Amino acid sequence: MYDVKNSRAIITGSAQGLGKEFAKRLLQDGCKVCLSDIDIEKGLETKSQFQKQFGLGDDAVCFVKCDVSIKEDWTELWESAEKFLNGPIDILINNAGLFPAVSY
């Protein structure tokens, strides 16, 4: 298996569900992770939970709000993550989803 220790990752849709589990595993394996979600409250809660659970500081995990349907949010996420993670991104997990506005 690929050694992710000291790698840098962005995970969209990481405040809950599979995205949160991906983040948890990468943090357990020593990866620095930038969490991202449209839900700011849940995102910050997830960040805090991981910091307490794994004894991590602000240098190991961050949260950036991102609506993946908005190009400017992607730009802000990428720039913030590279700055926080102090280098290029090694892993990108696009977990956030979009649903079409359809009336049933």
Question: Where does each model-flagged region fall?
Answer:
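Canonical Rossmann dinucleotide-binding motif of NAD(H)/NADP(H)-dependent dehydrogenases/reductases
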Residues: 2-34
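Structural signature of beta-strand start/N-cap positions in the alpha/beta core
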Residues: 8, 32, 62, 88-90
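Rossmann-fold scaffold of SDR-type NAD(P)-dependent oxidoreductases
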Residues: 12, 89-97
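Generic hydrophobic, amphipathic alpha-helix propensity
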Residues: 18, 43-46, 50
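Amphipathic, non-transmembrane alpha-helical secondary structure
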Residues: 20, 24, 28, 44, ...
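Conserved amphipathic alpha-helix within the SDR
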Residues: 47-51, 61-65, 70-87
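Conserved mid-core segment of classical short-chain dehydrogenase/reductases
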Residues: 99-104
